[in-house]
């Protein structure tokens, strides 16, 4: 079933991509990444059941002693709007593969690409009836899903504020919650980095999908010897990136998801300028289309630097040495993704060891994901649980049982 589902994602990629453009404001290349990743998630999940899922345990008694993994029963999946297909299927596929039923609640704004399309693909792939249910809805629906006694594990991807509520509710009902939450990821550009490549990486990390990605590069930490040229190069790229409707024209950035999010972005940008930051590029919008924005001369307390913006905003802060870089990069409640750019890989890895982060990329920006890799953050970015990779998925969607077996009934003195 999962292999057939993977093939269907590939077969219907164009149709499903259109829905991602229409609902989520994706540019076609980003939509293509989502459908390709959905296929890969299904192919990877198809092999999960053949992985060794238990162990033989030594016992002082004359018996066989085993630790084995069993399905939890029903898994509740709550997925967001920004990458609606990837962030749903990465839990749905492995949960099904490991013998569970799934109840999926997509964001109402992306109910087709993050929910109904998934149900249709699995239906066409031959998934038995009743194993996957889709419940589009708002906060009330999510609360009901977490509280339902049939749901034993909750997989949630969304904001840190919402994740805290999900975690609290799950704890009250004594069920596991796997939380992948917000971030304010740093890209650290060391003094020996290739400037042109660094600027390109920084632009991609901050402006891809309008900055509406949990691991978006939200903070640019640049060595003081490169900072002026880095800001100029990043601002030039921002000024020339086309913004518009990806359903009608070829653009680099599409629309912000709604007016509420657009207004939050603009409020943080204007508050940052009021606090002394210099607007090097952008800072304006037309409807839901927000120009990619570069802020220079920021401080650690500048609003767009200190908070997760979830928009196409690149605040640039300078540092003088590695100690200052480590302190600045680690000076946040979040710990999702980190990028470090340097010609000296050993130096970059040593710096990475000093900065708490669930994901680290040496000589790359902060946005990356693969079906085979464990994904998740620390601190306010998550509970340390992981999505992706066989070990993480088995841990997330099964329970451990201790099983002993004897050939005859044990004799006792009573």
Which residues are covered by each model-predicted region?
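N-terminal Rossmann-like NAD(P)+-binding subdomain of aldehyde/semialdehyde dehydrogenases
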Residues: 1-63
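Generic secondary-structure signature for well-ordered alpha-helical cores
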Residues: 7-14, 25, 47, 51, ...
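A structural signal for short, well-ordered beta-strand elements
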Residues: 24, 134, 191, 258, ...
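ALDH superfamily catalytic-core signature
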Residues: 161-299, 362, 409-413
